[in-house]
């Protein structure tokens, strides 16, 4: 193979490059060497770096040594040289002292350094500071296959790019006169927030000279150091026995009270970041990500990943992608709503309702509800048109396609992120068995087919029996939800009569709206109360199943909680959409609950207004409550902790707490990790897609909420929570499958909402079959003349049941008692051969509804599958970059190995120990 005979020296490292076989290389060899990748402190302002090698001369000249400075910031040991990588917290009064002593003795045996400090607030609390020296980091980084940078990436660019680059240079001259992109972070006044692209490889101590190491203290960033220390702690014994191992078990049995990595100092600074730079990465994250002043800017995902790890970085990447994709959905939804506003004055149906002063409607409840003119519901007819108009069907199809496009392009976006963050070839380590599983099944063992070691085993019969009990518990809780919905239904049918007899005319005349509004608020309270119960039941059932590993436990718990909360949140919405007013009977023969309460009817303008109110109120209240609990609850708890400290030590005494004590007083991350954050967004995604045909403004509300949600979550992670352990993940896990399921369900529900809940199909049938334009192939507004009258049936008042007969005889309308009233249905008049039987128009409408559901579902599903087929999971340029990177890495590894062998041969010749080798 043809190789380069000369190398380029950069500092301590002599780098050899393979000969490029194509001249179209973006970065030449000299640039590749002179522009090395950045270390952990390179994102900060040069004047604020805390590295000992960088700051020694500057600080000593000012009379202050580096160790003295490091002692003050609370991030180092007492000597000011060893950085704190992990904190353990326990109480001296805890009886598990023997286990801690064995555990800490083994920690020192692994090479970790340790110091202990008492709390300034409570002397019973002890902080154990842990530091991993370079030798320990290198040894375990090699075991964990931690990928580290060793060469700047070299991109292949086609010849066409040369011509395009010249054009871009000309365009860039004019761009200087244009305003800068407001959504991008200002990289001129702030430090560069993105890493330079570097080739990475699993760290190897034998090939350490090939990695880009400017400073051993910052080669492994703080998140990686903490992850390595946590990995060590999970494999240290605290007692004799094969299962007495790991920090998690000590946290479970109370030996340690807390364990966490440190934040990198304060998130605030007296000086502006634009003039003095960032004090630390936490400060940089706060200013560029968690501050409300940057709510409109893109997220610095690379910095989030460096500080919190890939798992949390992927969550914010997904949340940002979801929020960005909501922009077109919100715009189209707003357009549908505005289209209804613009066409409101031209809507023939609304005109006929508002002008129908001579049409008297039958009472909507027993006795107390009066007769009413159809024109009294003019406002509701206009509001219904805002959401149920000609653009609704288009919007439903658009949202179904949007959900597919969102998921397909997220797969592509995830692939790019996985490539940039070195997650393509990453595989999770073999998971440890849960301590609860080991304790339960320690007497039964079998050989693990992967590790070849004996492990506890759960019999198939035992597993099936537990799953059956768990499924029964899930079914019972779903029945509880249905019972709660049934209670809301009874409330609605009972309250509508009460409001109809109310003294206040405003409530009496709007009894149905008042009933719906109060029922929705009560339903929201029930939802929030049941959510607390569901969490405890889901936890109980998941522990009953005895999952083997933490990921199995997490997946099982996630499915249960999602199922419970989804049913809890949407059950009343499903009732209003598909059951309200569908099975009420007709005047003179009403259907009743337990032969007592008459089922609730829809408003004369239809049931869609009830569905809109349900979705709007629930969505606004739930998002407001979630945002308050996410930020307000930690703020209140942290304020209460500070208040207790001031009361114990006096408000006039100012205590300077070290960083470990400040972090200990913050709230720990949720016990379920990112579960609550994902669940909130997934339920919102369901609300945005499942009933979007009835509420086109749902995407807009979701967009506004998510813009706030991103900054709330960022603020919470940076300022209110302890720093979570930096974990790795390749994707969003089981949530992607749930999103796909919601996308499929949304197609079905929107088809039924359009066909059954809205009046789209009845209007269509009337226009083409019964209206003035019947048989002419037209369906404009002029073809809807007479639709309202055709959609109402006639009832003879003397046919009322005794318990349904209203107290009023309707003489207030014409001066004489009414003989007939109208109601929404397609039935024959009382004097026909079959009184109150279904008309032919009813069967035509029913057939059209069923046909629409079938056609809509098949059409949309075909479009979804076509889009999924046409959009590849990996972008073509990314696929080419991956293949080229693999090729170049092989070449560079070959060069490195060849260099090592040649060096060894020269040394053997020099020492006079040369012997024959066939290669090289």
Curated annotation (Swiss-Prot):
Keywords of the record: Cell membrane, Glycoprotein, Lipid transport, Membrane, Transmembrane, Transmembrane helix, Transport
Positions annotated with a glycan in the UniProt record: 509, 789, 802
Catalytic activity annotation: a 1,2-diacyl-sn-glycero-3-phospho-L-serine(in) = a 1,2-diacyl-sn-glycero-3-phospho-L-serine(out); a beta-D-galactosyl-(1<->1')-N-acylsphing-4-enine(out) = a beta-D-galactosyl-(1<->1')-N-acylsphing-4-enine(in); a 1,2-diacyl-sn-glycero-3-phosphocholine(in) = a 1,2-diacyl-sn-glycero-3-phosphocholine(out)
Stretches for region Disordered: 38-64
InterPro entries on file: Anoct_dimer, Anoctamin, Anoctamin_TM
Extracellular topological segments: 345-389, 492-512, 582-680, 755-850
GO MF terms, alphabetically ordered: intracellularly calcium-gated chloride channel activity; protein dimerization activity
Cytoplasmic side: 1-323, 411-470, 534-560, 702-733, 872-920
Locations listed in the record: Cell membrane
Tree of life domain: Eukaryota
One of the protein's GO biological processes: chloride transmembrane transport
Gene Ontology cellular-component annotations: plasma membrane
Transmembrane parts of this sequence: 324-344, 390-410, 471-491, 513-533, 561-581, 681-701, 734-754, 851-871
UniProt record similarity statement: Belongs to the anoctamin family.
Stated role: Has calcium-dependent phospholipid scramblase activity; scrambles phosphatidylserine, phosphatidylcholine and galactosylceramide. Does not exhibit calcium-activated chloride channel (CaCC) activity.
Record-given protein name: Anoctamin-4
Organism whose genome encodes this protein: Bos taurus (Bovine)
